[in-house]
Curated annotation (Swiss-Prot):
<dbReference type="Pfam" id="PF04073">
    <property type="entry name" value="tRNA_edit"/>
</dbReference>
<dbReference type="GO" id="GO:0004827">
    <property type="term" value="F:proline-tRNA ligase activity"/>
</dbReference>
<keyword id="KW-0547">Nucleotide-binding</keyword>
<dbReference type="InterPro" id="IPR002314">
    <property type="entry name" value="aa-tRNA-synt_IIb"/>
</dbReference>
<dbReference type="InterPro" id="IPR036621">
    <property type="entry name" value="Anticodon-bd_dom_sf"/>
</dbReference>
<dbReference type="GO" id="GO:0006433">
    <property type="term" value="P:prolyl-tRNA aminoacylation"/>
</dbReference>
<dbReference type="InterPro" id="IPR007214">
    <property type="entry name" value="YbaK/aa-tRNA-synth-assoc-dom"/>
</dbReference>
<dbReference type="InterPro" id="IPR036754">
    <property type="entry name" value="YbaK/aa-tRNA-synt-asso_dom_sf"/>
</dbReference>
<dbReference type="InterPro" id="IPR033730">
    <property type="entry name" value="ProRS_core_prok"/>
</dbReference>
<dbReference type="Pfam" id="PF00587">
    <property type="entry name" value="tRNA-synt_2b"/>
</dbReference>
<keyword id="KW-0963">Cytoplasm</keyword>
<keyword id="KW-0648">Protein biosynthesis</keyword>
<dbReference type="InterPro" id="IPR023717">
    <property type="entry name" value="Pro-tRNA-Synthase_IIa_type1"/>
</dbReference>
<comment type="similarity">
    <text>Belongs to the class-II aminoacyl-tRNA synthetase family. ProS type 1 subfamily.</text>
</comment>
<protein>
    <recommendedName>
        <fullName>Proline--tRNA ligase</fullName>
        <ecNumber>6.1.1.15</ecNumber>
    </recommendedName>
</protein>
<dbReference type="GO" id="GO:0002161">
    <property type="term" value="F:aminoacyl-tRNA deacylase activity"/>
</dbReference>
<keyword id="KW-0067">ATP-binding</keyword>
Amino acid sequence: MITRLSTLFLRTLREDPADAEVPSHKLLVRAGYIRRTAPGVYTWLPLGLRTLRKVETVVREEMDAIGAQELLFPALLPREPYEQTHRWTEYGDSLFRLKDRKGGDYLLGPTHEEMFASAVKDMYSSYKDFPVTLYQIQTKYRDEERPRAGILRGREFVMKDSYSFDMSDAGLEDSYQRHREAYQRILDRLGVEYVICAATSGAMGGSASEEFLAVSDNGEDTFVRATEGPYAANVEAVVTQPGVERPLEQAPEAVEYETPNAETIEALVQWAQSAGVTVEDRSVAAADTLKCLLVKITQPGAEEAELAGILLPGDREVDMKRLEASVEPAEVELASEEDFKNNPFLVKGYVGPRALNAHGVKVLADPRVVSGTSWIAGADAVEHHVVGLTMGRDFTVDGYIEAAEIREGDPAPEGQGTLTLARGIEVGHIFQLGRKYTEAFDVQILDESGKRAIPTMGSYGIGVSRLMAVLAEQRHDETGLNWPLEVAPYQVHVVVANKDKEAIEAGDALVAALDSHGIEVLFDDRPKVSPGVKFKDAELLGMPFVVVLGRAFKDGNIELRERGQETVLVSADEIVDTVVAKLNR
């Protein structure tokens, strides 16, 4: 295939778009792969669409290889199935909701679990039909509050979602593993640098869950890796090692002190040190204090929020992403000034767990706050704190929650050293959903004994358009993009940088010869464009191989450069064979 730049629908830009912050967004717009249509919505231009379709092909091939069957559901979906699983409300404002002319409620699909479960229910009734895995490559819609980073975080995006249906938990585990391996093959073929991380299930529900994160300093997700083992997890899924329980009878006496101007942890520690207060014969540190964060938690469909107190060691900040993940599908927000006014027992800056217990406020604690541990905490009175406030004796908790920040150097689980932090972009997520959706849709199947059984379900998503952005993010340099051969819009970019008639004719003959070998060629035949502009465009567009008919052509040589490597001179008689050999290696 030959595409001539003289006729290609393309305009490259020399300046970065004003709204672009990350390299992939800047380069994909500048190189004419995508074009902004609205916030979070992009047009796929010819070069971008070719690349996207090639990413789709890699994904499709690996899905077909594990026996998954492709279908396509509509993007416009009715409300009723999402009511059955409560996700009409659980998704909150991120759903694009709309009405038809008769007042019927619809949504633009953010994900399609309901549709897959409903289809299996309608079409299958016997255990003999199982296992089955179905998938689609479909455009999805989510009303992102702040769409950003181009196609990395948009309101419209292309995604492959697949769903496995098995009659047993063992079958689900097998389907899950086959998808896990397929995703590894996809990312390996594309050359993505990635990490498989333990993850939370969130609104999806289910049990086991893992994310595939592409390593990137510009990623929105923070993940951890163990220094001495294979452990890796999204920071939202990191489980804090619990504190050591201590006998209550050995706990120190709880003593209340006046603590002037000690509204912050730092000020409280300074007071304790200046007052000569000690903990186990040492100076007080921030980790000896107990921080109490007041929040409001709203359950899906609830009209009113519930007030709750989050307890954590004073040397730790609250990680709102971890807190939000811990309460999903509920929503959480910080308590307001109005909440303090409406609850006089809440003394701002001095709230402690005793008042929360006394007034029936739910208390959720960090796993380090265990029975017998003693703390310096608010005494629920202005400029007063309690030293020696002991969990299990002086206050109780209603449950535990992962809300504290994770730090570099924290202990890794199972003795795998310590944790290191890095950032990444989520490109895939796999779940063992279990029976949440099949039960919601009453998917009943006759098993081998003739009894009714409910199949178990797995969900597996991979961001197709996001993968393209990730490749641009990970594979670029200061001059432009650098596509892997597997998904580059064209394999070879031929540039005629010599205006001699002989060079122009040789360029035509060269691209024809490459085409005869089945090579996809982008041919810069623009007659009125300078060599310098052609070279800059070739760098920006990022094809794997660039062939230049330039000054060396008068000596019978043609320049050949693999993107990111040094240029070599090849005899004009050997250039076709050389390119073919490099493509087939």
